[in-house]
């Protein structure tokens, strides 16, 4: 598909700016059940033994608390706790790896928390453990999330020596007052030095995370952040919408409601961000992601072969995803499975059973069909009926008659073009892709649970 500019229609954005899922999975994690057990997981593992493997390892520790954070994390300065955690991870890895014998790992990602909480010896220990138990492709993507306050240049050298070739750095905002109010003060010069050094030593892909909607942010202050980010020139950018949920995330209670930008200011910041980044040469991938036109995500989207999973957008859609560590989520075969979310329960279950499986879901045929539909729309901004009809032996207009009725008002508003061959998301619809996907979500129709999701913008 051709690269489209976003058509910013404020009236439509305000009309459709209600809560909805982010669709890193379908069904979403709200449908996970503790009835899903180890036997169902083992059956899913055996279903597609030829699939390559993507690994995710969750490192929950942080030295400091960022007030905006909604991630599963443990704030501590006691480094020995990471050793205890690695002991449990070793048990889980040694127990899980034989199930995937013969499969090749094409992708590894360390997320958190703060993965660079680990010191050099701990980093090496974990990488050695993974390489000894899994078979990595020579060209595997090996990525890590980095907090610029928690790393030195020599640690970056160490990561590169251990095989890491991709880097994602949380910057959030360059404004000093904003940083102070969210307890995340950082050295701007060092961020530039870090990214430049990463490129010099052979990291092939760099990503910067920003957040809009933080306290004391204004369109003017965020414009400064965007200008500095453009000078950093990362391959990819993620610009997340801050969801203020202090009743759910205790740390957010330290943020004063009065300091937050108004809903209109947030929309102004988003509009400014999209305009600035697209004018700076970035392609809008969708949701909150941007990439350079020559980046593989941008290329894959233009070719209609982009995919999405719990780690975000990816070019590797034919892989099974195995998540390890506390709260980690796996996508194996036609199932989703999540590990214990609390560290105490994680330790106890790994010690007793060798795994930490807490809950999950085995997808029905209908789930799989709808997953394919939603993935095509959210990743590639279009859906061709023919491949769905062929793969699942159905007639699209009949099978999705109710869904197409729900989509009709969105088509009338110009968010999508619908004909007998498929659905094309328009320039107006790109920002509201979650709303478009929601038309095909039967779980939303069955239960009035939309308040449990973040707003789409």
UniProtKB/Swiss-Prot annotation:
Cofactor info, note text: Binds 1 [4Fe-4S] cluster. The cluster is coordinated with 3 cysteines and an exchangeable S-adenosyl-L-methionine.
GO MF annotation terms: 4 iron, 4 sulfur cluster binding; coproporphyrinogen dehydrogenase activity; coproporphyrinogen oxidase activity; metal ion binding
An example Gene Ontology biological process: protoporphyrinogen IX biosynthetic process from glutamate
Binding site for [4Fe-4S] cluster: 62, 66, 69
Regulation of catalytic or functional activity: Inhibited by EDTA.
GO terms under cellular component: cytoplasm
Pathway: Porphyrin-containing compound metabolism; protoporphyrin-IX biosynthesis; protoporphyrinogen-IX from coproporphyrinogen-III (AdoMet route): step 1/1
Subcellular location: Cytoplasm
UniProt superkingdom: Bacteria
Domain Radical SAM core: from-to ranges: 47-280
Residues given in the record as S-adenosyl-L-methionine 1 binding sites: 56, 112, 145, 329
Recorded catalytic activity of this chain's protein: coproporphyrinogen III + 2 S-adenosyl-L-methionine = protoporphyrinogen IX + 2 5'-deoxyadenosine + 2 L-methionine + 2 CO2
Known cofactor(s): [4Fe-4S] cluster
Reported impact of residue 58 to L: Results in loss of iron-sulfur cluster and activity
E.C. designation(s): 1.3.98.3
Family: Belongs to the anaerobic coproporphyrinogen-III oxidase family.
PANTHER family tied to this protein: COPROPORPHYRINIGEN III OXIDASE, OXYGEN-INDEPENDENT COPROPORPHYRINOGEN III OXIDASE
Misc note: The structure carries two S-adenosyl-L-methionine binding sites with only one binding to the iron-sulfur cluster.
Main function: Involved in the heme biosynthesis. Catalyzes the anaerobic oxidative decarboxylation of propionate groups of rings A and B of coproporphyrinogen III to yield the vinyl groups in protoporphyrinogen IX. It can use NAD or NADP, but NAD is preferred.
Protein name in the entry: Oxygen-independent coproporphyrinogen III oxidase
Protein's organism: Escherichia coli (strain K12)
Source species taxonomy: Bacteria, Pseudomonadati, Pseudomonadota, Gammaproteobacteria, Enterobacterales
Gene of this entry: hemN
